[in-house]
Amino acid sequence: MAARSLWRTRTKLLVVGTALCGGSGAAFIASSDDPSTTLKLCTSIPVRLYRNTVTAASIAFDYEYSLLGLAEGSSERAKVKHEVHLRSAQKLQELCFKNGGIYIKLGQHIGQLEYLVPEEYVRTMRESMLNKCPISSYEQVCEVFKKEVGEMPDQVFAEFDPVPIASASLAQVHVARTHDGKKVAVKVQHAHMTDTAAADTAAVGVLVNTLHRIFPSFDYRWLLDEMSESLPKELDFLVEAKNNEKCLDNFRKLSPHIAEYVYAPTIYWNLSTSKLLTMEFMDGAQVNDVDKIRKLGIQPYEVSKLVSQTFAEMMFKHGFVHCDPHAANLIVRPDPSGKRNIYGKRKPQLVILDHGLYKELDFNTRFNYASLWKALVFSDAKAIKEHSEKLGAGDDLYVLFAGILTMRPWKQVIDTSVDHLVIQGNKEDVSELQMYASQYFSEISELLRRLPRVILLMLKTNDCLRSVNNELMQGSSLESFLIIGKVSSQAVLEAKRAEKKSLMKWLKVWFEGFSVEARLWVMQFALWILQVRKSLTL
């Protein structure tokens, strides 16, 4: 009898508690500025957190159970680890698609960290995340317009195509025509992205931190920190618009010799807000569409050189770097001036899109990063160690850092032959690099933890550019490294000349500049010989 009474009391308390919580929640939702959005947040966030918890637990258990009792370094352990990596990558992929929003962005980040995370994760994310982003309905697009400008798309523009031409993790792009007849691209943020971003970031933090506690070698908290810092800026399209204009201004002021070959769309400020960005519509070929580039009368080789020089100038001279240069964000078109190269082919102009993610390098970081690349190109082991340590790699991981930057083993990095940094892109090279990433997973994770976040974004940028140049040059990388060597050397020398020095030190810098130019000329000539030999053997 007493037990039944106690049960009834507990039941009543549960009912009253549920009613109070439900009533309070309903009152909170009803009194909010946007009840429908608040309701969606209150129902979706717990579900996402639950999915994160289940996925993290499943991945952790799989690694712990599957690798139990397998000897470190054995072929059996390597085989099983590959299978676990693949299963875990697929679970993470499924989580990203189900949760959407910044989870897609996280998956895209992982897909671009080639040789920094296990190859199974990179391949799984790259095959899906870059081409299968969510699409907002036209009704959701109209909702964003109403909130931002108080009008529907067909009122703001003379014409507005309701079907997007492209969609990414944070936004999608529509073609429109202004009332004065200009064709424009309108970037529309996915509905409620800003509302869910903070909660999603916290939920992702639970996932990453949980995996790190279980597996200390899995330390990708830096990726979470980077997303937490970058995401608010990427979600503000007015920041992107300012980056767009600053990028072009830097080329005009600091790199006038290539300024006419680099372009970014004109921004229509009167038709832009933090969630709507209206810009000039750009025609051209995607940078990895080699066939279309050739049809435009442009040599892919010229495009590869322009891409390498453009981003080398950003990194080593401007200190203001576009950190998401994947193929969809780079368009090639014939230079509007009509200029041609010595072979009569049209010169390319590189159009850079999506300026939401930029990083600034302070003077010391930029100087050391430029000095490191100069040392890598010229096989200077002492300088590689010195500047790697100054960037945070330490005296125990500088060799690994050099390998990650160049994608070559140490013995090849310090080889003094002119083609020591060539990557042919064949299956043997790719397999070697993938094995390298898997074998040194713990060391790579520790290195990434040590390096400044801005350098981590430079690594991601390097991977994107390497992928683009591999497609343009069919795997050959020497020309790109020579351009990097030239621009990084110029940046180092400019920094040294800017210091107040004695006549003797000034002469030393002058001689260093002369020596660098001579070495680069010899390397360029050797490259020409290699290219002639290659053409004769075809």
Curated annotation (Swiss-Prot):
Assigned keywords, A-Z: Signal
Protein name: Putative ABC1 protein At2g40090
Organism: Arabidopsis thaliana
Family classification: Belongs to the protein kinase superfamily. ADCK protein kinase family.
Source species, domain of life: Eukaryota
Extent of the signal sequence: 1-26
